[in-house]
Amino acid sequence: MNVTVTLIGQMVAFGILVWFVNRFLWGPLTNLMEERKKRVADGLAAAERGKHERELAEKRAKETLHEAKEKAAEIITQAQKRAGEIIEEAKEAAQAEGERLKVSANAEIQQEMNRAREDLRGQVVSIAVAGASKILKRELDEKANEALVKELVAQI
């Protein structure tokens, strides 16, 4: 009988304990566990969102870098093209200047040749007059001398 009363006392104590735990502890513990579960789930979701955002940011950074490289390559290409154009313009300007100098030099040479011819004609005329004077052994007057010079110039 002692065993039965003790057993019944333990059962009653256990029942009170179950009721007490169920009434006062189980609800708050369950709520705490649910809140913790929710926080963990929210943390995992935030981590996943952060990972996704990081991947998007990396993708945007790669695209921006790629665009910058393309733009830089385009700028370099344009600069090289412009440099080639400048070189061609300089070559053309140098050729035009060379041609102008050549024409100027040719004109100057032509003028010098014409001056030399005129000087030579004058000398030839003087020599011819002197020769004619010696041949004729007489001096010609100025008008006759001038006519003789014109005739000699026409023949030369």
Swiss-Prot record:
It is found in: Cell inner membrane. It is a single-pass membrane protein. One of its GO terms (molecular function) is proton-transporting ATPase activity, rotational mechanism. The chain crosses the membrane at residues 1-21. Pfam families: ATP-synt_B. It comes from the Bacteria. The keyword Hydrolase does not apply. The keyword Membrane applies. Keywords: ATP synthesis, Cell inner membrane, Cell membrane, CF(0), Hydrogen ion transport, Ion transport, Membrane, Transmembrane, Transmembrane helix, Transport. GO terms for cellular component: plasma membrane; proton-transporting ATP synthase complex. Disulfide bonds: none annotated. F-type ATPases have 2 components, F(1) - the catalytic core - and F(0) - the membrane proton channel. F(1) has five subunits: alpha(3), beta(3), gamma(1), delta(1), epsilon(1). F(0) has three main subunits: a(1), b(2) and c(10-14). The alpha and beta chains form an alternating ring which encloses part of the gamma chain. F(1) is attached to F(0) by a central stalk formed by the gamma and epsilon chains, while a peripheral stalk is formed by the delta and b chains. Belongs to the ATPase B chain family. F(1)F(0) ATP synthase produces ATP from ADP in the presence of a proton or sodium gradient. F-type ATPases consist of two structural domains, F(1) containing the extramembraneous catalytic core and F(0) containing the membrane proton channel, linked together by a central stalk and a peripheral stalk. During catalysis, ATP synthesis in the catalytic domain of F(1) is coupled via a rotary mechanism of the central stalk subunits to proton translocation. This is ATP synthase subunit b.
